[in-house]
């Protein structure tokens, strides 16, 4: 079936919530401590799904890291060293994420960007801490990712933040009764379910119906959605990924007779490429996201322009922007450390203040940035993401 495009508008919600950053450490080899790595090569690892259901994320992430590296090398590298990207395909599975992590260790990576999915990153956080190598995930939003590990950071916000922002937006819109559809076996989906349900109570939103699938790869949600349609809910919170949301959940919800708002989180990014049937089904759909490509700031527009010129606009998404920021965060840390010593890089990451494509952020005790959130909506017309 031919894919259609939707346009997403940035709504007038930019909300900031304080989160937490990082500490601790282990010994790691010191390849240079004098601040000059001229003539050397710095390997940056990248663990992401190059193949599989979430390959669109991996494509944008890999492209964006390479874009950042190309810019860095053109400007003289990091401490005079040339930067090289080594990408490992985790296929969206924890076992392959572990395999990729071990391969990057053997290659002598200075730091690793990854993984993409929370389930995959969860499989390697303890390894990063044990081996003493900085791991920066651009997109794993599960709260548990950065609570205990000394060497683990992220450039994205976390699920408790997204869940609360969804509840706050629902209250602002007057949606007092909500239904939830989520995947019990997926770290991302179940974590967002938990944070939204908790926040809903805080904001006076009644959860009138909860339905679930065992994982995010389900095909038929019609039974659950029929129950939701009959529940009297004015909104449906469905924290799934774009490949389930676009061709399955949204059209099946409308076919079941659900006419209310449908909300999700950053996993909805990419839905515009996975639509099917009547595009009017995608009206009244909203999701939290990390940035808008229509933000007029110079840093955002420079990224959008450079990415589009190099790779085209079709593969660009928010996770790519987060990965671009993650690469520049690693650069900033290595330059501050004056070395590619792993512990020194970790120390330089802790408490970092960084201004990037996805916002002005500061890391604190759990390695998670304090930053703003955008809420986007779809409108059925040809075009691109535009800011309202």
What are these regions, as identified by a protein language model?
Residues 250-324, 378-379, 384-387:
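Extracellular/periplasmic periplasmic-binding protein-like sensory domains
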Residues 36-38, 42-66, 88-94, 117-119, ...:
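Extracytoplasmic "Venus flytrap"
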Residues 152-212, 235:
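An alpha-beta-alpha
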Residues 26-31, 56-63, 75-144, 213-221, ...:
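Beta-alpha junction/loop-to-helix N-cap segments that form part of ligand/metal-binding clefts
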Residues 309-317, 331-382:
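Segments of small-molecule ligand-sensing domains
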Residues 177, 193-288:
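Extracellular/periplasmic bilobed ligand-binding domains
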Residues 1-43, 74, 106, 387-388:
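Short, low-complexity disordered leader/linker segments with a strong preference
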Residues 97, 155-177, 190-192, 218-222, ...:
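Hydrophobic alpha-helical segments within soluble ligand-binding/sensing domains
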């Amino acid at each position: 079936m031919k894919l259609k495009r939707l346009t997403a508008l940035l709504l007038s919600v930019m909300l900031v919530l304080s989160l937490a950053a990082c500490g601790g450490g282990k010994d790691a080899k010191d390849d240079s401590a004098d601040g000059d790595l001229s003539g050397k090569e710095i390997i940056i690892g990248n663990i992401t799904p190059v193949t599989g259901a979430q390959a669109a994320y991996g494509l944008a992430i890999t492209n964006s890291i390479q874009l950042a590296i190309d810019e860095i090398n053109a400007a003289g590298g990091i401490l005079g060293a040339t930067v090289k990207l080594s990408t490992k395909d985790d296929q969206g599975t924890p076992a392959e994420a572990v395999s990729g992590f071990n391969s990057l260790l053997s290659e002598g990576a200075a730091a690793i960007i990854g993984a993409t999915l929370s389930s995959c990153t969860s499989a390697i956080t303890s390894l990063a801490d044990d081996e003493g190598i900085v791991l920066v995930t651009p997109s794993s939003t599960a709260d548990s990712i950065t609570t205990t590990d000394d060497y683990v950071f992220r450039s994205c916000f976390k699920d408790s933040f997204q869940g609360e922002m969804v509840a706050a937006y629902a209250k602002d819109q007057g949606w007092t009764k909500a239904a939830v559809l989520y995947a019990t076996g997926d770290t991302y989906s179940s974590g967002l379910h938990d944070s939204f349900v908790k926040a809903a109570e805080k904001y006076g939103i009644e959860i009138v119906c909860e339905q679930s699938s065992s994982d995010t790869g389900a095909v038929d949600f019609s039974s659950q959605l029929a129950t939701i349609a009959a529940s009297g809910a004015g909104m449906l919170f469905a924290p799934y990924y774009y490949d389930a949301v676009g061709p399955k959940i949204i059209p099946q919800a409308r076919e079941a007779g659900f006419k209310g708002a449908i909300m999700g989180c950053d996993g909805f990014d990419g839905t515009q490429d996975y639509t099917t049937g009547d595009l009017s089904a995608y009206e009244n759909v909203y999701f939290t996201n990390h940035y808008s490509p229509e933000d007029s700031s110079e840093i955002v527009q420079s990224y959008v322009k450079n990415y589009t010129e190099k790779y085209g606009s079709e593969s660009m998404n928010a996770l790519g922007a987060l990965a671009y920021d993650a690469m520049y965060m690693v650069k900033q840390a290595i330059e501050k450390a004056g070395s590619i010593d792993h512990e020194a890089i970790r120390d330089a990451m802790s408490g970092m203040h960084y201004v990037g494509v996805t916002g002005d952020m500061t890391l604190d005790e759990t390695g998670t940035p304090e930053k703003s959130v955008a809420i986007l909506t779809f409108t059925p017309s040809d075009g691109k993401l535009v800011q309202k």
